[in-house]
């Protein structure tokens, strides 16, 4: 399983090994997860020759069917039984991984380069807000850059997981802020309070429903979200706007974001080199000129 190894940054043991159509196997995705392997399939089974190769590694191999309920955890299909929870490293940063978790195992690998840039763009004295934070990976990188972070998510278990990730990296969670609830309502509250941030990360799910039943759809409401965040941005600050919504094209996404922040500079980074298949991730850096 040495594919893509030369493309991966140092001190990283969690990355994509095979990326579907980009590696000539549409619908099949293989991720190295420290000393475990996760193979995900969409609309197909694992090719027999690939399964044989995976089994030959001697590592625990897990299979996840993406067309099923996205909240179902992967199933181990080969290798020794090791703890389902473990620590992986990305660019020298440690994260808790949980193979028993549904939806995702604790980190989105396609955001690796964005996390590095968040760290580079963070500094002591800065405040960074991470909305829809999941397990707080962006927050950890920002804090390692010296910023004070606010980690915002609707789910308390995600905030607890984020605290664990801070601790894994020698960061005292009590020196950071954690907010539970709907991101839109928190942004409105921050704006009313005059609370601002030097950096804001917006990476919402494609579809969500808050605790009051209010629906959020990226293709309909992302621009409104960016406009709300704009009211909380310090002059000269930056935002990272991303979405994996496949219904929304890159140009439509750019247009939606640009309309919400007229006069701001918009730039787009390439995908990480181990993600060579579908260019599905919409992503824009927004800078206050």
Where would I find each of the regions flagged by the language model?
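Non-catalytic accessory regions of SAM-dependent methyltransferases
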Residues: 1-34
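S-adenosyl-L-methionine
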Residues: 155-199
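C-terminal catalytic and target-recognition region of SAM-dependent MTase-like enzymes
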Residues: 238-289
């Amino acid at each position: 399983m040495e594919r893509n190894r030369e493309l991966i940054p140092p001190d990283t043991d969690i990355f994509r090994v095979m990326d579907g159509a980009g590696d000539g196997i549409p619908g099949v995705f293989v991720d190295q997860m420290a000393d475990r392997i996760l193979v995900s399939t969409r609309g197909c089974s694992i090719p027999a020759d690939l399964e044989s190769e995976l089994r030959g590694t001697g590592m625990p191999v897990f299979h996840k069917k993406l067309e099923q309920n996205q909240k179902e955890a992967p199933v181990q299909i080969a290798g020794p039984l090791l703890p389902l929870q473990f620590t992986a490293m990305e660019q020298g940063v440690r994260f808790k991984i949980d193979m028993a978790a549904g939806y995702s195992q604790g980190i989105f690998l396609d955001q690796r380069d964005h996390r590095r840039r968040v760290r580079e763009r963070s500094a002591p004295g800065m405040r960074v807000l991470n909305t829809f934070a999941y397990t707080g990976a962006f927050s950890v990188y920002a804090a390692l850059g010296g910023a004070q972070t606010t980690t915002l998510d609707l789910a308390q278990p995600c905030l607890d997981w984020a605290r664990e990730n801070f601790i894994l990296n020698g960061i005292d969670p009590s020196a950071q802020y954690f907010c539970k609830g709907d991101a839109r309502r928190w942004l409105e509250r921050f704006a009313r309070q005059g609370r601002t941030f030097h950096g804001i990360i917006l990476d919402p799910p494609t579809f969500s429903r808050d605790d009051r039943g209010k629906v959020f759809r990226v293709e309909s409401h992302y621009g409104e979200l960016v406009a709300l965040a704009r009211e909380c941005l310090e002059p000269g600050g930056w935002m990272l706007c991303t979405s994996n919504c496949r219904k929304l094209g890159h140009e439509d996404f750019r247009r939606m974001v640009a309309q919400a922040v007229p006069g701001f500079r918009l730039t787009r980074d390439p995908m990480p080199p181990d993600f060579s298949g579908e260019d599905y991730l919409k992503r824009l850096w927004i800078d206050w000129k």
